[in-house]
Amino acid sequence: MSGQLPSSMVALPRQGIIILTYVLAALELTCLFMQFSIIPYLSRTLGLDSVSFGYLQTTFGVLQLLGGPVFGRFADQRGARAALTLSFLAASALYLLLVASCSPALPGVFLLFASRLPAALMHTLPAAQMVITDLTAPTKRPTALSRLGLCFGIGVIFGSLLGGTLSTAYGIQCPAFLAFVVTLLGAVLSFTCIPVTTKEASVQSAHQGGTSVFDLKAISRLLLLPRVLPVFLVKVISGFPSGLFMVMFSIISMDFFQLEAAQAGYLMSFFGILQMMIQGLVIGRLSTRFPEEALLRSSVLVFAVVGLGMALMSNVFHFCLLLPGLVFSLCALNIVTDSMLTKAVSASDTGTMLGLCASVHPLTRTVGPTLGGLLYRSYGVSILGHVQLMVNLLVLLVLWKKPLSQKGDKAR
């Protein structure tokens, strides 16, 4: 990683920029999960029924799905500083509208739906992944990306805890206002401390005077590269069944596991702690000892085993036994595929590639509630396990018959 980075207003060494990026990601994710913890209660307070709440969630997912690739291309062309600053400013706008929707004197339902609009530009995590990808050597990339799991775990645990505690003690608008202040601070830190670009000068010049940020042909060309499409399809197909289960988890925890709200919160905290441990500590070490394709196959295999367990489970204790395997598979699949995909494209396109990767989860959130709800109502929880088992056995068979080649140079 030779070459000089364009200066920021506050000079930081390369390692300092990476650490600050982790901090910014943790702050944004904490605010995001604070929002997730109050949205159901705010919706109920404003009189939304379950159908309207579903529309609200779908709107958020669709906007993030559409915005991810475009934001990634913007990050490649305009640099890390502009991308992170824009993401935090969009988040600030979302939380400000959320605060306004809590006021009885204002049209709350309209403002609540309007607060979803900035979600199209809220992509701090992909921007952070781009910074880390640009500033680390390819051999160290999986370990560096896996440390973002610690940030995610911090967001799940502290965001959910703060959201519930503050809304109970000071009102439902308090977490939203705190998130507004924190994301404004994140925008200031991004603008003053993050370099204009984290790409080297020779790489950044490839985008100067190039095509538009909204050039969908350039985005689709990247996705159709020979070493990109197979890995991306594995990422989408293998993770989709577990995504269906996670989308339906709030319903499953109430109906199937018979959990109270507090008990479901404890289970989510357990999930967050496991994710911190596995993604932050386990995956990084495994990536230094085993090839990425071996880790990818192992994640698909564990997905299949967990799917079998889900098909047979009958209570929450069984699910707790399956949870470490589920979290391992989710973490390994996401980290390994992100690393493989960024290595498969040129350094000038890493942001766009990570933006495409970031669209996978919103895709599940968009399609999942309808499909998952239909399967769950018709066949029960076991069908979600059977789908996960069969899909991942099929993916594993394809990977076994036709391995993903890791040879050759990056796409230029």
Swiss-Prot record:
It comes from the Eukaryota. It holds the Pfam family MFS_1. The keyword Translocase does not apply. It is a multi-pass membrane protein. InterPro entries: MFS, MFS_dom, MFS_trans_sf, Tet-R_TetA/multi-R_MdtG-like. GO terms for biological process: monoatomic ion transport; xenobiotic detoxification by transmembrane export across the plasma membrane; xenobiotic transport. Keywords: Cell membrane, Ion transport, Membrane, Symport, Transmembrane, Transmembrane helix, Transport. One of its GO terms (cellular component) is cytoplasm. The chain crosses the membrane at residues 16-36, 51-71, 117-137, 148-168, 176-196, 232-252, 264-284, 294-314, 316-336, 380-400. Its main location: membrane. CDD domains: MFS_SLC22A18. GO terms for molecular function: symporter activity; ubiquitin protein ligase binding. It is found in: Apical cell membrane. The keyword Acetylation does not apply. Belongs to the major facilitator (TC 2.A.1) superfamily. Organic cation transporter (TC 2.A.1.19) family. May act as a transporter of organic cations based on a proton efflux antiport mechanism. May play a role in the transport of chloroquine and quinidine-related compounds in kidney. Plays a role in the regulation of lipid metabolism. This is Solute carrier family 22 member 18. It comes from Rattus norvegicus (Rat). The lineage of its organism: Eukaryota, Metazoa, Chordata, Craniata, Vertebrata.
